[in-house]
Every structure is written in structure tokens, then in C-alpha cells.
A protein has these predicted regions:
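Interaction-surface and assembly-scaffold signal
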Residues: 10, 18-19, 32-34, 47-48, ...
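Aromatic-acidic/polar surface patches that form glycan- and anion
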Residues: 40-42, 89, 262
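Short, extreme N-terminal leader segments that mark the start of a protein/domain
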Residues: 2-71
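Alpha-helical context
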Residues: 16, 20, 72, 76, ...
Length: 296
């Protein structure tokens, strides 16, 4: 990828010296997206309970890096997010991601980086895989409304991962499936995460450099830690997620974490999502000097 600043985004360059795959273009931040989204909330361990990541919580192509960083789950509120981006700089696409909660990474003999991280993520667009500092995998998404004439109809969502090294063949079995049931009693209400005090909800995501593992799906290795603050605003409604896989599971525990979430989640019928330019960090979690920044 180019290490020269983009004409449309002066001063911004991508956090890698590797070439972008042929046929794709760099889509530099900021990204402003219109979407529909569902948030499923994993259980939050109490202070005296063990802090253990569920099976399938870490991307297998990044596991060696996670081991090197001694990645540790330390608790706190996480999310499973299903998102249908109607507009984006790389076109419409779907996304499934998992944020376990707070993670701690040992970045040096006397340094750590701690905070929220996306550790599993699937998208339906190779262009989205290419443009990100997150371990994205390609997948096919199915969303089915039970009653097209009912605006509060439950939706069945299933995600089928791409076969290894393929961008056109997908597993016949889903790694995640759920029935999403909007509340009929509780009306929509406005929510802007930017207005929520950080001591209640710190939305910053801390993402490690990506392994260039030769997966064949367009993922490009990166070289810098970065942090980004995603901004959500729009109308929200309470919803109730139900498992659709065998044995009452949401995720299969291999391709996606097997968690039993809270019985109540959030549905964003219309959401405005903003991804501002990330801040590149040193091993102490501090922003690098302006002249050394590489953002994506």
C-alpha cells in the first residue's frame, strides 16, 4: 500500500508498507455510514468470577500474535454486533463482530495496552477486508424477515464463513445464527453514544497490528497499533435475541464465540455510524508524534 498521503485525505496514509490487492482502492477515513444494527450483549462477569474468553473468541490467524502479546480478558461489557451498512465508502455490506470486553496486551517488558478490542469479525465485502486494521474474514450473510408487512417482524440472521483461501465459496453450515425479536411494548428512543460519559461507556477500540497470513481473502498485514472511537447515533429499540444453532447456541464455538448473552439487546432501525481517522499508538499506548502517524 502507498505510504504517500492521499489527495482526498491529505496527511493520511495507510499503516502498512504492503501493496493493496490488485483491483481494490484505498478508502481512507473518515467513514460515515448509514446502517441498521443489532447489539447482543454477552454476560458481564462479576468481580469475583473468573475472566475467561469463550471458545472461538480469537481469530485463529491472529492467535500467535495474541500469544506473543499475552492477550488477557479482564472483564467489562462487550458486544456482539450485527450490522447492515446501507452506505459506505466501499459500498453496502454486512458485518458480524465480537468485542469480548476489556482486553490487556503486553507490548513490552514494562508496557501494556488495555481496552476494548474487536477479536472476531466477518464482513460480506472483500473491499471492507482490504480497508481495515481489524482481523476481518469474508462471509455470506442471510437476513430473513418473518413478515415483510410488519415493521416489527422478527428477523432471522445467519452467517456462513468463506472457505479457506476462497472469496466465492462458503461453508454450508453457519457459524452464527439468531432470531432477533423487537419489543412491541417499549417504543423507539434516541441514543447518541458520543453523549454518554466515558466513565459509563468508553467506546475506544484498541487494535493490534495484523498478521499478513496469506489467507487469500484480501487481508493486508499492518504494522502499527491504533485506536479508534466509533460513533453511533440514531433511534434504538429494545429487542430479544434467541439462539438458532443446535444445542441452543448463538455461535458454534469455532468460527464464532459460543456465548449465552443477556436476554435483552438493542436494535438500531436507523443508525448513523462514524469512524474517524484512527490514532496510531506506540507500545505504551501513547499517540505517536505527528510526523510518524500512519492512520487507516
Amino acid at each position: 500500500m502507498s505510504t504517500e498521503a492521499s489527495a482526498s485525505s491529505p496527511g493520511l496514509v495507510l499503516p502498512t508498507s504492503l501493496p493493496i490487492p490488485e483491483g481494490y482502492e484505498e478508502a481512507l477515513p473518515p467513514w460515515t455510514l448509514d446502517a441498521e444494527a443489532w447489539w447482543i450483549l454477552p454476560p458481564v462477569p462479576l468481580p469475583w468470577q473468573a475472566k475467561v474468553l469463550p471458545k472461538g473468541a480469537l481469530d485463529p490467524f491472529e492467535e500467535e500474535r495474541y500469544r506473543d502479546l499475552q492477550a488477557t480478558y479482564t472483564g467489562g461489557l462487550g458486544t456482539i454486533q450485527l450490522i447492515r451498512y446501507h452506505t459506505s465508502p466501499v459500498g453496502p455490506y454486512d458485518e458480524l463482530l465480537y468485542v469480548p470486553g476489556n482486553m490487556s496486551y503486553k507490548t513490552g517488558p514494562s508496557s501494556t495496552i488495555s481496552g476494548l478490542s474487536v477479536t472476531r469479525i466477518y464482513v460480506s465485502s472483500t473491499a471492507s477486508v482490504v480497508n481495515g486494521n481489524i482481523p476481518k474474514q469474508l462471509a455470506r450473510f442471510e437476513f430473513t424477515k418473518e413478515d415483510d408487512s410488519d415493521p416489527l417482524s422478527p428477523v432471522i440472521a445467519s452467517v456462513y464463513p468463506a472457505l479457506l483461501t476462497s472469496t466465492s465459496e462458503f461453508s454450508p453450515e453457519p457459524i452464527f445464527s439468531t432470531r432477533l425479536v423487537p419489543s412491541r411494548r417499549i417504543p423507539n428512543f434516541p441514543l447518541d453514544l458520543a453523549r454518554v460519559p466515558h466513565f459509563l461507556l468508553d467506546p475506544r477500540l484498541f487494535q493490534a497490528p495484523l498478521t499478513n497470513s496469506g489467507q487469500g481473502n484480501g487481508l493486508v498485514g499492518t504494522e502499527k497499533w491504533c485506536t479508534i472511537i466509533p460513533s453511533y447515533s440514531g433511534e434504538v429499540r429494545v429487542m430479544y435475541p434467541e439462539p438458532r444453532l443446535s444445542e441452543g447456541k448463538f455461535g458454534d464455538g469455532v468460527g464464532f464465540p459460543d456465548v449465552q448473552p443477556m436476554s435483552v439487546g438493542l436494535w438500531w432501525p436507523t443508525a448513523k455510524i462514524l469512524f474517524t481517522p484512527p490514532v496510531i499508538l506506540n507500545v505504551f499506548g501513547q499517540p505517536v508524534a505527528e510526523e510518524d502517524k500512519k492512520t487507516k
